């Protein structure tokens, strides 16, 4: 049963991102289409701080080297210290609405040259940036220069997948791991064309060669990073991929239609009740919750929406008065692991949690009117 637990109201613009601090489960960051970020204390359900981090919609919030990272349509990626002062600003290409991905000290973004391609950066703890891969053409890797006939077209063809729409990193036990790369994850990229490509990033270790008999006389050889193709699926073609999720290490994808694909072997195709799948979230690794552009949230046989005051009786009038869903995420039980023995600060947080009856997991849904609703699951 999905029941409303509480509502967070401080944003004046459409909610664009919701991010739970992985270090402190009651510390929440929310962002909107104006570039404003609000830091919430969930134990009291009040803002602790807010700041104008960007000048346009925020597309990604994450963490790197224990610092908050944000990415916006204003063509910048920023890293913030504990006082929320910017310690590093990186120009980026945000012509599309794609997110970016962070894994360890690596940053994976749409290429600065071409929104269809990928760049990969390494950011060290001193905030030094190294570009490992530049303007990588995923289409060429998949098709090796071949031209693909567009489904539903007559004689026309294309030579790319269009812009990157969404990216998702999924840790997997099936990825081939060698002493050369130590990679245990797949980077899935969803495109405007409807194609989804899974890539393995290879980061070869530097080799040390002795050029003479003297063991102190050595040469360090750095080999280039590269991508290896692990997966390609075109079931969504010609509809753009707009959301990617993870179901027990298996990719799940949604598009502008009512089709959801579970990328198992063989794939499973689900026909949903509504088109325009805004978000898919994983609940307890074996269940999915779906959110749609029209504001509906679906969990199994349960379907709910948040309506504005009704002024009309027709279905068309009612649909116009439904809150539009803009972001959805889940706060999982695993995030409570940072609360250990009930001593000191953790004891205080546990007491506040008990008083406020804040029990995970919670589903958080952000809406076009700036409100964020928390649902018990």
From Swiss-Prot:
GO biological process: chromatin organization
Keyword list, A-Z: Chromatin regulator, Nucleus, Repeat, WD repeat
Pfam families: WD40
Organism listed in the record: Candida albicans (strain SC5314 / ATCC MYA-2876) (Yeast)
First and last residues of every WD repeat: 10-50, 53-90, 230-262, 263-303, 342-377
InterPro entries reported in the protein's UniProt record: WD40/YVTN_repeat-like_dom_sf, WD40_repeat_dom_sf, WD40_rpt
Subcellular location: Nucleus
The name this protein goes by in its record: ASTRA-associated protein 1
Encoding gene, per UniProt annotation: ASA1
Record note on quaternary structure: Component of the ASTRA chromatin remodeling machinery complex.
Main localization, broad class: nucleus
Listed SUPFAM superfamilies: WD40 repeat-like
Coiled-coil zones: none
A GO cellular component annotation in the UniProt record: nucleus
